[in-house]
Each structure stands twice: as structure tokens, then as C-alpha cells.
Amino acid sequence: MKDFADRYTFIRQGKMLVVKILPKEIFVLSFRRIKDKELKKLLEKDYALR
């Protein structure tokens, strides 16, 4: 999961989640739709650090 965190940038905009995959691709996801618990935890931790 560490590699994942290093390569991806997560930006929260309201209930939408913008996932920036370095260097340039951007995906917009609904935060609620993320089923992967590990990923969700990582995202929540990432938000807490900002």
C-alpha cells in the first residue's frame, strides 16, 4: 500500500474524490463508492494529514 500512496494524490472536493495518478491522469470517484477497506483507510488518513 505504501507504493500506492506514493504514486497517487487524493484531493477531496465535497463528496467527490479527485484521484490524481502521477504524472497527469485524473479520475474522479465518489468517496462513498470505494469498497476496498484498506484503500478507504489510506484515503481517510491522507485527508487527515492535509
Curated annotation (Swiss-Prot):
Highest taxon, organism lineage: Bacteria
Name of protein: Uncharacterized protein HI_1569
Taxonomic lineage: Bacteria, Pseudomonadati, Pseudomonadota, Gammaproteobacteria, Pasteurellales
